[in-house]
Structures are given as structure tokens and as C-alpha cells.
């Protein structure tokens, strides 16, 4: 039976700019959306211009002082916020840039609306590639993330769902989400990530398992450099299969950070786009309501390829290896294909013995769980969102390609030999 897929895209979200030289480039979202349009994948989905989250929405997880600061600070007045900038960890990795709060509002609102639509059974799968900012903490920004849209979306899902499973395939540990739900059995967090050698954020070893009611409901899969498709699959599928069997989630949130691909500007894994997509396809195969989010990914042309390919998997539509012509076509030179070779010469340091040891430890921890913990569900409060449905595009107009204004900042999108941001400084 075909799944109903809701797709959330704000035409302005790709216009925000963290600053010259910063590896996080929201413009990758415009590039992804362009491919989704030109491949015709929008025809297989319900396309929404998303709700914009309010301060109240963000304060469901974050502190009021922190969100008030994000709303007030700007490049023009930040000199008056020196104490707050330090207190809230806003500065180098998480800079103040024009429209910062608006950017947070747009990506968070889309995740929130996706959760609400899943709750109301409007869709089976909700996609927000702008979301997935998993490092943000209750009181501070972290790792290019300001507002944790994932936590806020999960809190919305918990109104209707007794158990939510969170899966994270970003190369970085999903520390902000784990921390938020560390003491509860209502959410199980599973993160596959690079661990060791002071790799950011430095958390996520196998022995972080949760505490109090949440003991054994945080599951970490610490990986070493150079993991390839075969090794990743050897762990991912059996672990997720066992987790779903033991935990019996009624909804899944999947963070699809694309920095786990080979040749990522900040990564050190060796996954292909197909290998990354295989994880998405496997999670989809459980036929459990699914919220799909973006995350990291810093070689932008490959991020767009990856998330477009994964959109095609989610709507069960085979798409051509040759990329369709679009306004961004030249960014995919020289091959102009969906699945270029992204492998590197980084050695796979994940031996079969090491992977089997991780798997064994995880399976032993899973045996400590109560099968499918039961929770008392109280009266469901009204939906967080009361967005105006007139904002939804007319289905008859979804096929038209809007002429969005897409200003590009200098150095925003170079991705090759002349990249002033040194985007290609990856060992090949």
C-alpha cells in the first residue's frame, strides 16, 4: 500500500547565511529542493510551506532566557550582548547572522508541523530536510545548531505516541536529543557516529545508556574512521531490527545527517549515497509512522544528491542516474550524476571483530529493557499548531516551479577547486 508522504519546504530557508567561510550552508536546502522539483518527485507528495515556530513553541524545550536572546540579538547589536553570547555559547561555531531567529523559526516550525500531521494521520511519512539540528541544548547553542527542532518535534509526538524511537545516522553524536530524553523510557535514542580522537562533540560511547527511568533507553554505536557501506549495514540493520522488536515504537524520527558520506568536508566515513539511503529504506520498511529530518552535511553538492535520492526512496519512485537540468546544474560538474564515486582512501578502521563486539554489547543492553514499556496516556492537549490551512499550496499548483528570490552570498556555494572555504580539503 502506497504511503502518504508530506514534504515541508520554505522557499526562504536556503537564503540564510552563517557567514563567509562557515561550513554550514543553508543554501544546500535550495539545491536539494531544486532537484526534488526537477525530478518530479513533488508529484508523489503533499507539499507544504511550513508553519513558523513561535518563541512559545521553542520554549517547550529551551529556556525562555535563551530563546529571548536568540530573538533579540543581531549582528548590529551583538556588542551589547557580550555576557549572553558567552553564556549561551553563541560565537564562532554558532555565529550571530542576519535573520538568525527567523531561520530557527522556519526549520523548527516544519519539524513541528510534520509531527502534528503524523499525529493526526494526515500522512504516514513527513520530510523536513531543513531540520535535524541535533546538538542544540536546553540552555545553549552547539555545533551549528541553535534550536533543537528534533526534541520539540518529539515532544509533540509524545502527545499521541506512547513510545518514540529516535535514530541518528549523522557522523556526529546526537548529543542534544540524547540529553533531553536521558531520564525517560518514552523515547529511545539510537545514534551511530564517529567516536574518539576528540571528534565533536566528544560524547556517545557505548556506556552512555540513560539513567533513572531511561536506563538502557539511550543506545550509542561508536564507530571509527573509514566505515564503508558493508560494515555499516552489518551493524545498522541488526541493531535497528532488535531495537524495534524490543521497544515496539509507535513512531520513529530519523535524522539523516549527510556528513557520514565519503568526501564530506567535515567527515571521515566512507558511505556511498546508496549506502546512506539503504538505512532510510530499511527504517521505512517497518511501516511505522516516520518523521524524516536532515542534519549535518558539508559537501553541499553531495548533500543535495543524498537527500534527493532518499526522497525518491520514501515515495517509491525510481529516478534517473543523470541529473535533470536546473538552475544549479553546474554545481554538479564534472559528472552531473546522482551517484558519483564518493569513496576515499581513508582506511576502514572498523574491523569485523570490533563491530561484532559493539553489536554484542548493544544486544546485551537491549535484554535489560522491559519489552515495550507501557505508559499512562493522559488527555491529549490541543495541537500545538493552529496554522492556517490556506497557507498550503493548491494541489493543482504544486507542479509549477515558483520563481523564488535566491540571493547568494559571496563564497556561499563554491564546491570545487576554487572553493574559497577550502571545501575540498578532504583526503581522497
From Swiss-Prot:
Enzyme Commission number(s) from the entry: 3.5.1.98, 3.5.1.-
Enzyme class: hydrolase
Keywords noted in UniProt: Biological rhythms, Chromatin regulator, Chromosome, Cytoplasm, Hydrolase, Metal-binding, Nucleus, Repressor, Transcription, Transcription regulation, Zinc
GO annotation terms (biological process): chromatin organization; circadian regulation of gene expression; epigenetic regulation of gene expression; negative regulation of transcription by RNA polymerase II; regulation of circadian rhythm
Presence of keyword Cell division: no
Catalytic activity: N(6)-acetyl-L-lysyl-[histone] + H2O = L-lysyl-[histone] + acetate; N(6)-acetyl-L-lysyl-[protein] + H2O = L-lysyl-[protein] + acetate; N(6)-(2E)-butenoyl-L-lysyl-[protein] + H2O = (2E)-2-butenoate + L-lysyl-[protein]; N(6)-(2-hydroxyisobutanoyl)-L-lysyl-[protein] + H2O = 2-hydroxy-2-methylpropanoate + L-lysyl-[protein]
Catalytic site: 135
Molecular function via GO: chromatin binding; DNA-binding transcription factor binding; histone deacetylase activity; histone deacetylase activity, hydrolytic mechanism; histone decrotonylase activity; metal ion binding; protein de-2-hydroxyisobutyrylase activity; protein decrotonylase activity
Region Histone deacetylase: start-end pairs: 3-316
One Gene Ontology cellular component annotation held by this UniProt entry: nucleus
Protein name stated in the entry: Histone deacetylase 3
Naturally occurring in which organism (per UniProt): Gallus gallus
Lineage, highest ranks first: Eukaryota, Metazoa, Chordata, Craniata, Vertebrata
Amino acid at each position: 500500500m502506497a504511503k502518504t508522504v508530506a514534504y515541508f519546504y520554505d522557499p526562504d530557508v536556503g537564503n540564510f547565511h552563517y557567514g563567509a567561510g562557515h561550513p554550514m550552508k543553508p543554501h544546500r536546502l535550495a539545491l536539494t529542493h531544486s532537484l526534488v522539483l526537477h525530478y518530479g518527485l513533488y508529484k508523489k507528495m503533499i507539499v507544504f510551506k511550513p508553519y513558523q515556530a513561535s518563541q512559545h513553541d521553542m520554549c517547550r524545550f529551551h529556556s525562555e532566557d535563551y530563546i529571548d536572546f536568540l530573538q533579540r540579538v543581531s549582528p548590529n547589536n551583538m556588542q551589547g550582548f557580550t555576557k549572553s553570547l558567552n553564556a549561551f555559547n553563541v560565537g564562532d561555531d554558532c555565529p550571530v547572522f542576519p535573520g538568525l531567529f527567523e531561520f530557527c523559526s522556519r526549520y523548527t516550525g516544519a519539524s513541528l508541523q510534520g509531527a502534528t500531521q503524523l499525529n493526526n494521520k494526515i500522512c504516514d511519512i513527513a520530510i523536513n530536510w531543513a531540520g535535524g539540528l541535533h546538538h542544540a541544548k536546553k540552555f545553549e547553542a552547539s555545533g551549528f545548531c541553535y534550536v533543537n527542532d528534533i526534541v520539540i518535534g518529539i515532544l509533540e509526538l509524545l502527545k499521541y505516541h506512547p513510545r518514540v524511537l529516535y535514530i541518528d545516522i549523522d557522523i556526529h553524536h546526537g548529543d542534544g536529543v540524547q540529553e533531553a530524553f536521558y531520564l525517560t523510557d518514552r523515547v529511545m535514542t539510537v545514534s551511530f557516529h564517529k567516536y574518539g580522537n576528540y571528534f565533536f562533540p566528544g560524547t556517545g560511547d557505548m556506556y552512555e545508556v540513560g539513567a533513572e527511568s531511561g536506563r538502557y533507553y539511550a543506545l550509542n554505536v561508536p564507530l571509527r574512521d573509514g566505515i564503508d557501506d558493508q560494515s555499516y549495514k552489518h551493524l545498522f540493520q541488526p541493531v535497528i531490527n532488535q531495537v524495534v522488536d524490543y521497544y515496539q515504537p509507535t513512531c520513529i524520527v530519523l535524522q539523516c545527517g549527510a556528513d557520514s558520506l565519503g568526501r564530506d568536508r567535515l567527515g571521515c566515513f566512507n558511505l556511498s549515497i546508496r549506502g546512506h539511503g539503504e538505512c532510510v529504506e530499511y527504517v521505512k520498511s517497518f511501516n511505522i509512522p516516520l518523521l524524516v529530518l536532515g542534519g549535518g552535511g558539508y559537501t553541499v553538492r553531495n548533500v543535495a544528491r543524498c537527500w534527493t535520492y532518499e526522497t525518491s526512496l520514501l515515495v517509491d519512485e525510481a529516478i534517473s542516474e543523470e541529473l535533470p537540468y536546473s538552475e544549479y546544474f553546474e554545481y554538479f560538474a564534472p559528472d552531473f550524476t546522482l551517484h558519483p564515486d564518493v569513496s576515499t582512501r581513508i582506511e576502514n578502521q572498523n574491523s569485523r571483530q570490533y563491530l561484532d563486539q559493539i553489536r554484542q554489547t548493544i544486544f546485551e543492553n537491549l535484554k535489560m529493557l522491559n519489552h515495550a514499556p507501557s505508559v499512562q496516556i493522559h488527555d491529549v492537549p490541543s495541537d500545538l499548531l493552529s496554522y492556517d490551512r490556506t497557507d498550503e499550496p493548491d494541489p493543482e499548483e504544486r507542479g509549477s516551479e515558483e520563481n523564488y528570490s535566491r540571493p547568494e552570498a559571496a563564497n556561499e556555494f563554491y564546491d570545487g577547486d576554487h572553493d574559497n572555504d577550502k571545501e575540498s580539503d578532504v583526503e581522497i
